[in-house]
Design a protein with these regions (language model features):
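Sec-dependent bacterial lipoprotein signal peptides
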Residues: 1-20
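Short loop/turn and low-complexity linker motifs enriched in small/turn-promoting residues
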Residues: 20-155
Length: 155
């Protein structure tokens, strides 16, 4: 019985280590520019930020915007997009759960989302919610911009 627990523990440990993948990073100069939080009068802007919480650190959820995968977020990372005014949907996808957040955005508006990993049955569940402008700017200011998801699959 003890051998079975040791083997299962080794498998779980290996799975956690292999799940701890890096994500493609964005341009540091662009990140510095985005952290000025200058609104675009012709488009809405969204920031999706994952803070540095330790729980779920090995999980890199996929961010989908309007049905298209656009980024993966590790701890202390954020994703940025400019969108035409109107209705949109952002989704955080993990192995076990899709967290969807439909929203409406206007030209010149900035919307901040926070994402984190909560407990799940098999793996952590990605959760997304809006945060205040102040909370969003604080998270983004202490995080790094991720690159597009295509950069991860091109390697």
């Amino acid at each position: 019985v003890i051998r079975i627990f040791i083997r299962v523990g080794a498998l779980v440990g290996t799975a956690l280590l292999t799940a701890c993948q890096s994500v493609p990073m964005g341009d540091p100069a662009r990140s510095a520019e985005l952290k000025k939080f200058a609104p675009n009068p012709n488009a809405g802007q969204i920031y999706v930020c994952r803070d540095d919480r330790f729980f779920g650190a090995a999980i890199t959820p996929t961010v989908e915007l309007n049905g298209k995968p656009v980024a993966r977020l590790a701890r202390s990372n954020y994703f940025f997009a400019e969108l035409p005014p109107g209705d949109h949907t952002v989704v955080i996808k993990t192995l076990e759960h899709d967290s969807k957040f439909p929203f409406k955005i206007a030209a010149g508006q900035q919307t901040f989302f926070s994402t984190w990993i909560s407990f799940g049955i098999i793996a952590g569940r990605g959760i997304i919610d809006t945060v205040t402008t102040e909370e969003g700017k604080k998270c983004v200011s202490s995080s790094e911009l991720v690159g597009p998801i295509e950069a991860a699959t091109a390697k």
